[in-house]
Amino acid sequence: MGIKEIIVEACSDDIITATEAINLFSIITESEVSKVDKDFKPKESMKLSSFQKIHITESIIEEYKSKYPDLKHVRCKDTDTYKCDGYMWLDGKNLVCHVGSCEYLDDKTKWIVSLEITKNYKGHGLSKQLIDYAVKNMECKYLSVDKSNKLAKMIYDEYGFKVYQEDKKMYYMTLDTNPVKS
């Protein structure tokens, strides 16, 4: 039985509340994902262009959210405040990675709001390619990253993003020399 199943069982047996389960799962997955491995050896390089790219729609993202729980935070619905855009790359029927953006209508800033590479495709050099795609093709210049996600922060730093603001939980980063958002 995996960690997720154990937490679900504990929840259903009223050992812990749903909120406690969510917090516990976040702590566990956060510690697995955000570590910077000093002895990391890259795997064989993969090219983003070798996978099938599809434009994200609300129905497509909802379909994949059921198969890939890590996508639960991905949104693809425009509002009065922002306009969403995004792409997924598939290897056959398997999700390789995705990037989502939002353009805020008030100041026209474009943000990377979600960027994920699925487990089997991590370590193959896709992160920089995905950021490149978001910056060059989607014109994103802003992002926020959780302070506990040290690996993502390191990747964004290496790409050239700079912190222009932070709070207790997040770094707000940009490629702009004079950030619009404050």
Feature locations, PLM:
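Conserved beta-strand-loop-alpha-helix junction that forms the acyl-donor binding cleft
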Residues: 143-154, 169-175
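Charged, low-complexity interaction regions
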Residues: 12-19
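Conserved active-site alpha-helix within GNAT-family acetyltransferase domains
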Residues: 128, 148-166
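Terminal substrate-recognition subdomain of acyl/acetyltransferases
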Residues: 41, 162, 167-182
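Active-site acidic-Proline motif in GNAT/NAT acetyltransferases
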Residues: 118-120, 124, 147-148
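Conserved N-terminal entry element of GNAT/NAT acetyltransferase domains
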Residues: 8, 34-62, 73, 180-182
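Acetyl-CoA-dependent GNAT
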Residues: 49-114, 118-119, 131
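Conserved acetyl-CoA pyrophosphate-binding loop and the N-cap/start of the following alpha-helix
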Residues: 121, 125-133
